[in-house]
Regions:
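N-terminal glycine-/charge-rich "phosphate-binding" loop or analogous flexible N-terminal tail
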Residues: 1-38
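Glycine-rich adenosine-cofactor-binding loop
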Residues: 7, 89, 97, 116-137
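NAD(P)-binding Rossmann-fold cofactor-contacting core
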Residues: 10, 138-155
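Phosphate/diphosphate ligand-binding glycine-rich loop within oxidoreductases
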Residues: 40-113
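Rossmann-like adenosine-cofactor binding region
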Residues: 49, 151-244
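Phosphate-coordination loops involved in phosphoryl transfer and adenosine-cofactor binding
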Residues: 60, 116-119, 192, 201
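Rossmann-like dinucleotide-binding domain for NAD(H)/NADP(H)
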Residues: 201, 207-371
Length: 373
C-alpha cells in the first residue's frame, strides 16, 4: 500500500506506518507524476486535488484532507471516479477558538475594551463557530449568530441576518466555509458594500478562508477610515502571495496558523487514519493520546483568587498570538508565507494543562481547559 502524505501533517508516519509505505511530499508544489503510484493520498488545504493532479493515477483508493475546509478538493471529480473522500471536520475547532480568544484579549488590552459590554457577531456556526459561541457566552459576552443554513435545519436557532449583524455587532468573526455558488455564497461576503454597513469601529476577525473577505475592499475601507477599525487576519486572499499593503492596518496578522496547534493538526491526521482503517477493514492500532508528547506544563494548582485576568495571562503563557504576528512581519519578505507555516513553533492547546484547586471558575471548561477530576 503506497501512502502519499503532505510533509506538514504531524504524526502521519507514526499513524500510517502499519498500513503501508509512507511517502511525504511538498503540498504546495506536488505534481501528477509524483502521485502516480499513490493508493492513498493525504493532503492539507494548500493542495488542489482535481483532475489535473490525479491524471496519471489509476489506482487511487482514498483521498483525505486533514482540514475542516474542503474547497481545495474537487469532490465531484472524485465521485465520478468512485474514489472515497474524507475530511476532518472539527479537528482544529478548539485551536481556532483559542486563537480568536487570545486575539480578543489582545485587542481588549490594546484598545481598553470591556468585552462584557461588546456584541460579537459570529458568521458561520459549525464546529468552530459554535464552540467559540459557547466560550464567549460563558464569559458573559453577548453573541449574535449568523448561519442561514443552520436556521433552516434547526427550528428555534436564533439566526441574525448578515445585514442586520453588520449593523449591530461591535466585533465580527468569520467561521464559514468558502463557497461561490448556492443560496448563501460566502466568497467576498465582506465586500465594499457590506463593509460600509459596519459600525465605524467594528472589529473584523477572519480565521476561516481568505476570500470570505474582499481584501482590496477591506484595504480601501481601512485607508479611508476616520476611526480606527481593529482587524485580525489569519487568512488572506491569494495565499501565499498575500496583499502586504494590508499589514500596516492589521492589528494581528498571521500566516493561516489559527488551527495549527499540535493537537489540532494531529487530530486531523488521526481522523484520516481512522477512516483509512475502516475503508481497508484494518484494526485501529494508534491513537493521538498515545502519540502526543508530554507537554512542558502538565498540571497547575490555582487558588480561589484565580480570576479572568489570571485566565488571560495563563492563556498567553500557553499561546501568545502576538508571537505569530511578529513572526509574519519579521519573516514574510525574507522567507515567505509557506515557510512560516512549515516552520511553525510547537503550540499546545489549553487542554494540555490540567488545572486543580478548591474553587475553580465554572467557565474554564467552556474555554477548553482541562480540570482535574
Amino acid at each position: 500500500m503506497q501512502i502519499f502524505a503532505d510533509e506538514n501533517m504531524p504524526l502521519v508516519q507514526q499513524f500510517f506506518a502499519d498500513l503501508g509505505d509512507v511517502t511525504l511530499f511538498n503540498g504546495r508544489n506536488v505534481t501528477a507524476s509524483q502521485l502516480q503510484q499513490a493508493d492513498i493520498l493525504l493532503v492539507r488545504s494548500v493542495t488542489q486535488v482535481n483532475a489535473d493532479l490525479l491524471a496519471l493515477n489509476t489506482k487511487l483508493r482514498f483521498v483525505g484532507t486533514a482540514t475542516i475546509g474542503t474547497d481545495h478538493i474537487d469532490q465531484h471529480y472524485l465521485a465520478q471516479r468512485n474514489i472515497p473522500f474524507s475530511s476532518a471536520p472539527g479537528c482544529n475547532a478548539q485551536s481556532v477558538t483559542e486563537y480568536v480568544l487570545n486575539s480578543l484579549w489582545c485587542l481588549a488590552q490594546k484598545y481598553q475594551w470591556d468585552l462584557s459590554k461588546k456584541t460579537l457577531g459570529i458568521v458561520g456556526v459549525g464546529n468552530i463557530g459554535s464552540r467559540l459561541a459557547r466560550a464567549l457566552q460563558a464569559l458573559n459576552i453577548k453573541v449574535l449568530l449568523c448561519d442561514p443554513w443552520l436556521a433552516e435545519q434547526q427550528p428555534g436557532f436564533e439566526h441574525t441576518a448578515f445585514s442586520q449583524l453588520c449593523q449591530q455587532a461591535d466585533i465580527i468573526s468569520f467561521h464559514t466555509p468558502l463557497t461561490s455558488t448556492g443560496r448563501w455564497p460566502t466568497r467576498h461576503l465582506l465586500n465594499a458594500d457590506t463593509v460600509a454597513q459596519l459600525k465605524p469601529d467594528c472589529a473584523i476577525i477572519n480565521a476561516a478562508r481568505g476570500a470570505i473577505v474582499d481584501n482590496a475592499a477591506l484595504l480601501s475601507d481601512l485607508q479611508a477610515a476616520v476611526q480606527r477599525r481593529a482587524v485580525v487576519l489569519d487568512v488572506w486572499e491569494h495565499e501565499p502571495d498575500i496583499m502586504t499593503a494590508l499589514l500596516p492596518y492589521v492589528d494581528i496578522a498571521t500566516a493561516h496558523i489559527a488551527g495549527h496547534s499540535i493537537e489540532g493538526k494531529a487530530r486531523g491526521t488521526e481522523m484520516l487514519y481512522q477512516q483509512c482503517c475502516q475503508l481497508l477493514q484494518r484494526p485501529v492500532k494508534q491513537s493521538l493520546d498515545r502519540l502526543l508528547a508530554v507537554p512542558a506544563m502538565e498540571k497547575l494548582q490555582i487558588s480561589p483568587n484565580f480570576g479572568l485576568p489570571d485566565v488571560q495571562n495563563l492563556a498567553r503563557l500557553l499561546y501568545d498570538v502576538r508571537r505569530d504576528d511578529a513572526l509574519l512581519r519579521c519573516y514574510l519578505h525574507s522567507h515567505g508565507f509557506d515557510w512560516l507555516r512549515k516552520n511553525y513553533p510547537p503550540r499546545r492547546e489549553f487542554s494540555s494543562l490540567q488545572l486543580s484547586g478548591s474553587l475553580i471558575p465554572t467557565y474554564l471548561p467552556q474555554l477548553g481547559f482541562n480540570l482535574a477530576q
